[in-house]
Amino acid sequence: MTIDAHHHFWLYDPARHEWITDEMSAIRKDFLPKDFEPILKQNGISGSVLVQVDQTETENDFQLKLAEENNFIKGVVGWVDLQADNIEERLEFYKQYKKMKGFRHILQGEADRALMLKPAFMNGIRKLKKFGYTYDILIYTDQLKYTKEFVAAFPDQLFVIDHLAKPNIKEQKIDEWKKDIEAVAQHENVYCKISGMVTEADWHNWKKEDFKPYLDVVVKAFGTDRIMYGSDYPVYLVAATYEQMKSIVDGYFSSFSKDEQEKFFRKNVINFYKL
């Protein structure tokens, strides 16, 4: 059975979710476990990892409550203010929740593109290992050049890059992204989520072959031990159904060995997040 390593839930609020633009109207509504669980069952998915959207500790409360009520949610990636003076105290607080596995900051939205390298931010990252937490790196491709230095500073900290670092699949731009993500992948404490690809493609005219060059790069760079499958529910709905989105990776990995497929669809996410 497969585990979906990346999805979201929210109670839609136009002010809080201003990033959901007019052209993304398909996701301008509430998305909750009752909406997602039937989709998982239809697609042979046995569990999932719920990832933060809002950058508040209220978001953690919301996610942890859903995880407590829904057994299919095997882990939660929350948010804390990594630059706060009391960061260690906040990390200690969340240890009481067995399903809290790691944290994420929406670096892709920061005006300071190199925020990850700022001393206060790095101080927060430095504390994660003590409590056994992972860190999800959410960035755009222009930030990959800082990411190599960032992950090199914490060789014992587990990181995972979300959504292949969002290459421009629509315009088939690959060269600079390829060079940068290969450099990051040299650090063996870094994994990559093969997730969210359709949202970086031409939403209305994408073809499966659009994704192959990017998948080739990531699989070769990270190997089959450091990649994991994620859907990015419900964001992919702007461009595909779950079945259409998953068929991209099902088709691509169909020629891989059973063991390699098992790693990608299940084992790696369990090992990474200690599910």
Regions found by a protein language model. Name each.
Residues 9-10, 166, 235:
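Short active-site segment of divalent metal-dependent hydrolases/proteases
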Residues 37, 64-65, 92, 148-149, ...:
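Active-site phosphate/pyrophosphate- and oxyanion-stabilizing loops and adjacent acidic/basic residues
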Residues 115-228:
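Catalytic pocket-lining loop regions of alpha/beta-barrel enzymes
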Residues 1-3, 21, 25-47, 217, ...:
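Mid-to-C-terminal alpha-helical segments outside catalytic/metal-binding sites
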Residues 1-131, 142, 175, 248-249:
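Mid-domain alpha/beta scaffold segments of enzyme catalytic cores
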Residues 58-73, 155, 160-161, 212-220, ...:
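Short, electropositive alpha-helical surface patch
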Residues 40, 67-68, 95, 151-152, ...:
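N-terminal cationic-hydrophobic initiation segments that often serve targeting/anchoring roles
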Residues 232:
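Active-site glycine-centered loops adjacent to acidic/histidine catalytic or metal-binding residues
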